[in-house]
C-alpha cells in the first residue's frame, strides 16, 4: 500500500470504534470541503468537536458514544490539517481565516446555539471562535488548551522541533512517549498516530494568544479542563491565568492526564465532566 493508503486504512480502523449509525458528510466552505462525522439523536442539542492538531476527528472515538447519548455530535477534521477535509479554497493566513471557516461550517449545518469543545490546537480555534461569535454558541469546553491563557513550554516546543529530525515513521510516537511517558495504550490509536507520518496537511495556522480584555469579556459559559501531567505547558500556571482572565469559567484539572493522553485514554472521568457540563 502507498503511504497515504496506510493512513486512510488506519483512519477507517479507528472509525470502526465509533457508535453505530455515525455518518460522514462533506460540508462545502470557502476554504474547501470539510469532513464531519455526525452521530446522536437528530433532535439533540448540537455539539461540535474540534480535535488537537494532527489527530483528526478520529481523536474523539472514546468520547463519541457518551456525548452522543443526548447530543447531536459533529466531529470535524480541521481544514488544512490531516484527515479528509480538503483545503483547496481560500488561503489560511491566520486565526481570522479559521473563525471564518468555522462560521461557514455553522452556516451550512445550521448550528447556531451549538455547544463547542476542542482539545489543544482545536481548543485554541474554539476559544477564538467564541470570542469572535459568542452569540452563536451555547457552551464552550477547552481541553488542555494551548496558547489560550499562558505560553507553551519552550521545552515542549524544542522537543517537537527535534522530533522532526527523526525518520518520519517515528515522529508521532516519539513526541507522545516523551510527553506522556509511554506509548498510546490503545493499539488501534497507536497505529493511527503512526499512520499520520504518511498523511498530508496544507497549513496549520500560527497561534497568537487572545487579548486579555477579550477573554475577560467573553460571555460564553466555559469549562477549562487541564491535564495535570501536561508537558505542553505549566498546568497550574494555566489554571491560575484562566481563573484570572475568565473568572466565570469552571476550571478543573485531571491529575493523571497528560496533554497527549487527552481525550482518548482512560476517558471515563473526562466524559463525565463533559456530559455534566453540556447537560
Protein language model annotation of sequence segments:
Residues 223-258:
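Conserved loop-alpha-helix segment in the C-terminal half of the alpha/beta-hydrolase fold
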Residues 257-267:
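Catalytic histidine-centered segment of alpha/beta-hydrolase-like enzymes
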Residues 74-117, 271:
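Active-site loop/oxyanion-hole signature of alpha/beta-hydrolase fold enzymes
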Residues 51-53, 114, 118-123:
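Conserved alpha/beta-hydrolase "nucleophile elbow" surrounding the catalytic nucleophile
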Residues 30-83:
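Conserved HGGG/HGGXW glycine-rich cap/lid loop of the alpha/beta-hydrolase fold
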Residues 124-131, 138-167:
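Flexible "cap/lid" loop of the alpha/beta hydrolase fold
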Residues 151-156, 166-220:
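Conserved alpha/beta-hydrolase catalytic His-Asp/Glu region
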Residues 1-47, 70-71, 111-112, 272, ...:
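Alpha/beta-hydrolase fold catalytic core
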